[in-house]
């Protein structure tokens, strides 16, 4: 499974996502960054990366003056850079010989999408596949545990499961209009919606998750929050194994917080395991050189939800895959297995998430554009 996961990540990046990202950024003055930042901000990001590079620290340790170090980054130099290469019917990663300035090589490296993938056995917690990126030798940044990104709509199943635990059902109806929620400071928050269907009509809570509807989600947030605070939802996320710092804002229901792939995978086991959350297990046993077992390890299990609340959430997440935002997975790859899932995008599609689970496997995939947070 590990080999398949690594190959699939490289294949999808090299053949589909990276070319699309390159076309999107082509001709933009601030490429590979968003045009929402100024050229001065872009230069600051690059300058910071220069001072965090191995070349900079090596020259500084050798006693080279600061001015000379910085000047060296603008001199064309022979080097090897990361690239995708076609090999038969698939793609591989390689190092390509070239000549460019070290500063340009930093910008070049930031044009490549980052990614992280993890799969674990939902029943035992054993990690089956772990891919921290397309090539760790080049991008020494683990997007499974180190990299945290805004989770967007993949946070919604947590809110909906919390609602199920509070007595709501997938069949409960509400008027599909834009909600207006009051923040603690008295200001009004009115979330936008990506779609325009069913406006002014009665819809179900299950319909809201199936179509990743922001208005239904925000309405639920209002029902579960008090005085504009979402402390109860924050506490619930922590009970699901999320250790990241989370601000208790109303917009949290739409995924404004940063969470890691590892945290997401562990939390999603709750829905397929009748409300019991499994912690990821990386090592099952230790043996000495003679083959004697020194220690055995098992995953820690936490009861998060009553079984009926977990089942109601599971039902809604199945619908996401059967006819909602995740249904393309079935049509494109011809998968008819029983599964649930959730998609999520954030920050003008700079981050893309896909959560999916079967009765025995929980997975999370993240694709993300280069970010100043990685610099």
Locations of regions flagged by a protein language model:
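Acidic/histidine-enriched alpha-helical segments
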Residues: 21-34, 175-180, 281-292
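Non-catalytic, structured segments within soluble enzyme domains
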Residues: 1-62, 220-223, 234, 238-239, ...
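Active/ligand-binding-proximal structured segments within catalytic/core domains
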Residues: 140-162
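Glycine- and acidic
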Residues: 112, 137-146, 214-218, 245-252, ...
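Mid-domain, small-residue-enriched loop/turn segments at the edges of structured enzyme/sensor domains
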Residues: 188-193, 225-266, 275, 279-282
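Conserved catalytic neighborhood of penicillin-recognizing serine enzymes
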Residues: 168-231, 277, 289-314, 318-319
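A generic secondary-structure signal for well-formed alpha-helical elements
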Residues: 9-20, 162, 166-170, 216, ...
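A penicillin-recognizing enzyme superfamily signal
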Residues: 2-15, 46-121, 126, 130, ...
């Amino acid at each position: 499974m590990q080999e398949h996961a690594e190959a699939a990540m490289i294949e999808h990046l090299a053949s589909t996502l990276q070319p699309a990202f390159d076309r999107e950024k082509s001709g933009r003055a601030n490429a590979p960054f968003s045009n929402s930042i100024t050229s001065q901000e872009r230069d600051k990001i690059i300058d910071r990366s220069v001072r965090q590079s191995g070349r900079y620290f090596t020259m500084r340790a050798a006693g080279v003056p600061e001015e000379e170090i910085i000047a060296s980054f603008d001199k064309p130099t022979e080097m090897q850079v990361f690239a995708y290469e076609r090999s038969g019917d698939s793609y591989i990663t390689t190092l390509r010989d070239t000549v460019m300035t070290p500063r340009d090589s930093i910008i070049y490296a930031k044009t490549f999408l980052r990614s992280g993938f993890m799969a674990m056995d939902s029943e035992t917690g054993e990690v089956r596949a772990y891919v921290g990126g397309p090539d760790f030798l080049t991008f020494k940044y683990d997007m499974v545990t180190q990299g945290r990104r805004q989770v967007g709509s993949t946070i919604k199943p947590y809110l909906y499961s919390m609602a199920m635990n509070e007595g709501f059902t997938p069949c409960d109806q509400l008027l599909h209009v834009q909600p207006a929620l009051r923040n603690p400071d008295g200001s009004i928050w009115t979330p936008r919606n990506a779609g325009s269907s069913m406006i002014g009509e009665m819809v179900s809570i299950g319909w809201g998750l199936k179509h990743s509807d922001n208005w239904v989600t925000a309405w639920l947030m209002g029902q579960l929050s008090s005085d504009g605070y979402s402390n109860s939802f924050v506490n619930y996320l922590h009970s699901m194994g999320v250790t990241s710092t989370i601000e208790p804002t109303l917009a949290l229901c739409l995924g404004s917080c940063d969470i890691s792939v590892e945290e997401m995978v562990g939390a999603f086991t709750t829905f397929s395991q009748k409300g019991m959350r499994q912690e990821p297990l990386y090592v099952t046993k230790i043996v000495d050189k003679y083959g004697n077992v020194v220690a055995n390890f098992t995953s820690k299990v936490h009861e998060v939800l009553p079984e009926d609340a977990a089942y109601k959430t599971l039902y809604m997440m199945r619908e996401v895959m059967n006819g909602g935002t995740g249904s393309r997975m079935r049509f494109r790859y011809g998968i008819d297995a029983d599964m649930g899932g959730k998609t999520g995008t954030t920050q003008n599609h700079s981050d893309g998430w896909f959560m999916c689970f079967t009765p025995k496997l929980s997975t999370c995939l993240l694709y993300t554009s280069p970010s100043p947070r990685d610099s």
